[in-house]
């Protein structure tokens, strides 16, 4: 029998975390949004408020629904505040050692029957589950960015994930109004296994001088009908995240076709991470984005 999920914890108040809190609260779940940084919590709550206000202005949700959703979210700086959650979703930086540390500390305070999930975009669910005291109640729930707008959620079972956890997680995602894509536990799952090598190839195309930033993005938008060019999309995702996923693919599948482009590595080393640092393949510090190469 699938567990009943009523209260959801979200670890990390950044772009993914506040997005998950937003859709969960709007769907009627009580939410505890956790972050060790008070500033990030404040910023995350402000983002949720702003995004809900935008949905009201577009008549996607009512003012009443917005007010109720905000009333369901509690901001918390301590993991102890997640103790009675039925499901906790981790959205920390895409570094395995960071996630494992969070899970170790979380499981020390979380009720035994609760489900633990990771929003990881590439890391093995089986390995992450091994850092917990409940591998059978551990699962990957990978949302797409931006969470309030994107309809797909990847659901990934680890080797020990039991049927009750899978069914409860699947039901939770359905209540959010999202479509489930079930993926096996292989590096980067489905979406990023396909998407990130394309982005990496676009970066190689720039690195090798085949085309400049504008030409590459225009080629894919106008020639392949993509809504965003691959370099623009890389900046949106975050170049550090792109690099982490390519490294997981390269190490996990041992195939040279997944080798991260040296230019991607150089940008990350320079701290040019895309939109979040105002510089990446585009410079966002002016009135409109300008290609950096």
UniProtKB/Swiss-Prot annotation:
**One Pfam match, by short name?**
3HCDH_N
Q: Which GO terms describe its biological process?
A: butyrate metabolic process; catabolic process
Site for Important for catalytic activity, residues: 142
Gene3D superfamilies recorded: N-(1-d-carboxylethyl)-l-norvaline Dehydrogenase, domain 2, NAD(P)-binding Rossmann-like Domain
Q: Which GO terms describe its molecular function?
A: 3-hydroxybutyryl-CoA dehydrogenase activity; NAD+ binding; oxidoreductase activity
Involved pathway(s): Lipid metabolism; butanoate metabolism
EC numbers: 1.1.1.157
**Catalytic activity line of the entry:** (3S)-3-hydroxybutanoyl-CoA + NADP(+) = acetoacetyl-CoA + NADPH + H(+)
Q: Which UniProt keywords apply?
A: Fatty acid metabolism, Lipid metabolism, NADP, Oxidoreductase
Similarity comment: family membership? Belongs to the 3-hydroxyacyl-CoA dehydrogenase family.
State the NCBIfam families in the record: PRK05808.1 (NF004474), PRK07530.1 (NF005715)
Q: What is this protein called?
A: 3-hydroxybutyryl-CoA dehydrogenase
Q: What is the protein's species of origin?
A: Bradyrhizobium diazoefficiens (strain JCM 10833 / BCRC 13528 / IAM 13628 / NBRC 14792 / USDA 110)
- State the gene name recorded for this protein: hbdA
